[in-house]
Design a protein with these regions (language model features):
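Catalytic-loop of the protein kinase fold
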Residues: 131-149
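Conserved N-lobe ATP-binding subsite of Hanks-type protein kinase domains
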Residues: 34
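ATP-binding glycine-rich loop module of kinase domains
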Residues: 40-62
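Structural motif at the C-terminus of the N-lobe alphaC helix and the adjacent alphaC-beta4 loop
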Residues: 66-74
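Short beta-strand micro-motifs within the conserved protein kinase catalytic domain, predominantly
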Residues: 78-89
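Activation segment signature within eukaryotic-like protein kinase domains
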Residues: 119-120
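Activation segment/activation loop of eukaryotic-type protein kinase catalytic domains
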Residues: 148-184
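Structural motif in protein kinase domains
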Residues: 96-105
Length: 280
């Protein structure tokens, strides 16, 4: 976010959002803008405040507020309020702890096998719940999985600004596969089909989880990190070919063998295929 916008947001700190929420400090950013730690000045409870400038040509926070309202479940932050304040769209939600990405970095890019197994089970449960609501996340990455609190080992899934319905709850009709040529997500973890610009479905969220686990097991390194091209399309094309031609047996040789089994299962899933719990 530009310094001019940041300065405008700093001015907003002296005001109250919705009459009672005040920004305390910036704690991160999402697919929409900045995330702040805030406080409800009435009950003194801390909250997370997401801020998106209204004139950016999109409204991801409105979309996210709709999804959060309809999700309501274990491991999903509570939507407290959403609306407009001055030049900004503002979403208030539960304040959570640090992301797996930040914890991983603080721990010198290392997680124990026990830790990875414990949070992987929760991550799969979270994405299964999201999928049960006919929703795909489309931006699976360590920064979008947070710990609830220091004394609570509960994993939360966040940031639904890029999410999409894959099936109509009214007609039960699945979206159709197509090559959109527009990539959505984070290329480092995105599925092979997503990186090549294909419409995403449940299988793509699962494949992205697999790349995230490979990242953790390999000390925070994946073969396509650092790929640089003048055009984004060229970069995505290069990453696509690197992922497509990855030798799992070689790259995952020091990881649990289940990683290879899992990745091969994800790669074989058909576009509309419902995920078999026994395989994950």
């Amino acid at each position: 976010m530009s310094s001019s916008i940041q300065n405008e947001e700093n001015k907003e700190k002296v005001h109250l959002f919705f009459g009672k929420y005040r920004i305390l400090k910036r704690i991160g950013c999402g697919s929409f803008g900045n995330v702040y730690k805030g406080i409800n000045i009435i009950d003194k409870k801390n909250v997370a405040i997401k801020v998106e400038k209204k004139d950016e040509g999109y409204n991801l926070l409105q979309k996210e507020s709709y999804y959060l309202y309809n999700l309501k479940g274990i491991g999903v932050p509570e939507l407290i309020s959403y609306g407009y304040s001055g030049k900004y769209n503002v979403l208030i939600q539960t304040l959570l702890g640090e992301s797996l990405g930040k914890i991983f970095f603080k721990n010198s890019n290392r997680f124990s096998l026990k830790d990875i197994c414990m949070f992987t089970i929760q991550i799969l449960h979270r994405i299964e719940f999201v999928h049960s609501k006919y929703l795909i996340h489309r931006d699976i990455k360590p920064e979008n999985f947070l710990i609830g609190s220091p004394d609570e080992y509960m994993i939360y899934i966040i940031d639904f600004g890029l999410s999409k319905k894959y099936k109509s709850s009214r007609t039960n009709k699945h979206i159709q596969f197509k090559l959109t040529k527009k990539f959505t997500g984070t290329a480092r973890y995105a599925s092979i089909n997503a990186v090549r610009g294909a419409e995403q479905s449940r299988r793509d969220d699962l494949e992205a989880i697999g790349y995230m686990l490979m990242y953790f097991f390999n000390g925070g390194k994946l073969p396509w990190q650092g790929v640089s091209c003048k055009e984004k399309a060229q970069k995505y094309a290069k990453i696509y070919h690197m992922k497509k031609n990855l030798n799992y047996q070689e790259f995952c040789k020091n990881m649990p063998k289940e990683i290879i089994t899992y990745m091969m299962y994800c790669r074989e899933l058909q576009f509309e295929k419902e995920i078999g719990r026994a395989h994950v």
